[in-house]
Amino acid sequence: MEQVSQSAFYRWLRKGRIVSQAFFFLLFVFLFVKTDYTGSDSIEYAVNILFRIDPLLALSTMLAVKTIIILMLPALLVMVFSLVLGRSFCGWLCPMGGLLDGWRRLFGRVRKNEATRFPSLPAILLIFILISAIFGVPLAGYLDPFSILVRGLSQAIYPGLNEVTVSFFTFTYQHLPEALNRIVEPVYSFLRYTILPFEQKFYQFGLVSLFVLGLVVAAEYVQQRFFCRNLCPLGALLGWCSRVGLLAMSGGDESCGACRHCARICRMGAIDEQRKIDAETCILCLDCFEQCPRQIISFAGVLPISRGAGTSLSRRRFLTTASASLVLPTVLGVRTLNVQADPLLIRPPGALAEPEFLNRCVRCGQCMQVCITNGLQPVMLRAGIEGMFSPYLVARTGYCEFNCTLCGQVCPTGALQILGMAEKHQFKIGHAWFDKNRCLPFAKGIPCIVCEEHCPTPEKAIKFRNSEVVDEQGLRRQVRQPFIDDALCIGCGICETRCPLPGRS
């Protein structure tokens, strides 16, 4: 009777895990959707909490900046959680894990489980990331599962969803009878109010982010939880904590005979042929317990000495990884001091000095997602290899709104400081200049005051002086030519955004 009640308890516990995974994935989606302009100058929800509880981002960022980042201290809770319940975060809470499990359930095919292809690679990548961070090369954001997920969603899938939805309802509005439109219109209004973004956005390297996320999902057809088992450095870090976890799954014994059904169905490949469960890899999904024919697998307190061997790195691999991490800045030239900064690399308002900004930026893409004007874009090689996917302002796409401070509010690491409105109005992110070979009053003698009309500074950073020019007909005429008041210009870029000429002006 006791065994039956215990069996029922674990079955309900497994169902609870599925509910937990679904709940936290939906919570992630909710916070993702709320990382957008909603008509308010402040963000109502802790939309950056996912990145603030990420131990990989927290540890690597603090190592890079050599200080404690208060914003990221919640990550300690996940570390403590892993010390008690092992790597259960990956099976119960992680939205990337929820996406992969849901994708396989809906679109995957059932196949025999296989041994993990590259069991040591996540630990190698983790060591490489942490040592590189110490020497000023931030790499965690490139492989962190949360950064990959949010970048792919915000820079490709979400804008694509909005484009398809708006196009569909525009088509129905134009072609359906008025009676049907009365039914369709409330549906669109509901989607616009609850799910769709404030405006249609486009990201110049969005397909790159989509490609990376697509590879992670497509790898499910190679092996279940391929990314989690073979690449994820966050999983490796939580796995290290799991080595001393107080609770874990306890595997079968010799009385199981030749069954080994648990090893064949384990989504993480955490059970070996001797039915020993590796706590460093096990995510406590409880599949093995539910499907064990003899109900011999249990969940209980386990001493570290009784655990599976886990994944260990040889001394040679460790030294090779450490050496590569040390020479990376020199070999790749990612931190050469004699390279002049690109004048067109304009960081968002509140950005710290470039070296510390790059060390703190985790490439989450939330500042770009929340940008009202779509002016913030991901940079590729313009900022060097270490600066890929970090944000910069492309004024031809959108300007920095004078009364907006949302990007600093969503930044999880403090790479972008939270500015008060008075500070924002004075914060200089760049400097405007005129291409006199193209600007209409200079190049063609045609009057134009568009840039000055849109300048948001109270005293107008763009001013005019009367000049005599020769127009295209060879006639002399007086034209007001613009110039920049350096003391007033904050580099918001609206003058370039609104300029009637195409291209750089």
For the regions a protein language model found, what residue spans apply to each?
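Non-ligating segments of multi-cofactor redox enzymes
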Residues: 1-275, 280-281, 286-505
